[in-house]
Amino acid sequence: MSIRFARKADCAAIAEIYNHAVLYTAAIWNDQTVDADNRIAWFEARTLAGYPVLVSEENGVVTGYASFGDWRSFDGFRHTVEHSVYVHPDHQGKGLGRKLLSRLIDEARDCGKHVMVAGIESQNQASLHLHQSLGFVVTAQMPQVGTKFGRWLDLTFMQLQLDERTEPDAIG
């Protein structure tokens, strides 16, 4: 298994992983699936913004993906990113999520980001545990802010401070 930067050719596999999460889990709070063109547009927007899209790969097959983007679009949030990590269901439980997220944290630090945010459906114990094990702390619980599969969903926000800067725009 290897982790590498995604290529446009990976977007069909990324769409497949995304769509499985849409159809069968509460990890993505969308009801509509996407096609490869949608993921290509997403990929191009991320890379144009200077943000990484990573994939895990085994024997030439994309088994997961991870990325981060702006947490909010206002200038004051420029040092904060929100991430996503998804693993193909056939490859879950093998530590790929941990490897992808660990690499993504390194990429965020390399980009000079200060905080990484995770928005996690509050019943997703595997994701909550993974994030906690990598140093994320719970910062907010938001009951019944979403809905999927005919039920209310609660949202847990977690965050990881990526550096020790005391001044927001200090270099080094």
Curated annotation (Swiss-Prot):
Entry EC no(s): 2.3.1.-
Gene it is expressed from: mnaT
Single Gene Ontology MF annotation: acyltransferase activity, transferring groups other than amino-acyl groups
Cited InterPro entries: Acyl_CoA_acyltransferase (IPR016181), GNAT_dom (IPR000182)
Reaction catalyzed: L-methionine + acetyl-CoA = N-acetyl-L-methionine + CoA + H(+); propanoyl-CoA + L-methionine = N-propanoyl-L-methioninate + CoA + H(+); L-alpha-phenylglycine + acetyl-CoA = N-acetyl-L-alpha-phenylglycine + CoA + H(+); L-methionine sulfoximine + acetyl-CoA = N-acetyl-L-methionine sulfoximine + CoA + H(+)
Taxonomy, superkingdom: Bacteria
Domain N-acetyltransferase as annotated: residue spans: 1-163
Protein name: L-amino acid N-acyltransferase MnaT
Key words, A-Z: Acyltransferase, Transferase
Biological role: Acyltransferase that appears to be required for E.coli optimal growth rate and yield via the formation of N-acetylated amino acids. Catalyzes the acylation of L-methionine using acetyl-CoA or propanoyl-CoA as acyl donors, and the acetylation of L-phenylglycine. Is also able to N-acylate other free L-amino acids and their derivatives using a CoA thioester as cosubstrate. Using acetyl-CoA as an acyl donor, substrate specificity is methionine sulfone > methionine sulfoximine > methionine sulfoxide > methionine. Asparagine, lysine, glutamine, aspartate and glutamate are very poor substrates.
Matches recorded under CDD domains: NAT_SF (cd04301)
Mutant lacking the gene: phenotype: Cells lacking this gene show a reduced growth rate and a markedly reduced yield in glucose minimal medium compared to wild-type; this phenotype can be partially rescued by adding L-phenylglycine to the medium, which reflects that other enzymes may also catalyze its acetylation, but with lower affinities. The deletion mutant strain also shows a consistent change in the level of several metabolites whose masses can correspond to L-phenylglycine, L-pipecolate or N4-acetylaminobutanal.
Practical application: Expression leads to increased levels of N-acylated L-amino acids which could be used in a number of applications.
Family: Belongs to the acetyltransferase family. PAT/BAR subfamily.
Annotated acetyl-CoA binding sites: 85-87, 93-98, 124, 133
EC top class, as a word: transferase
Organism the protein comes from: Escherichia coli (strain K12)
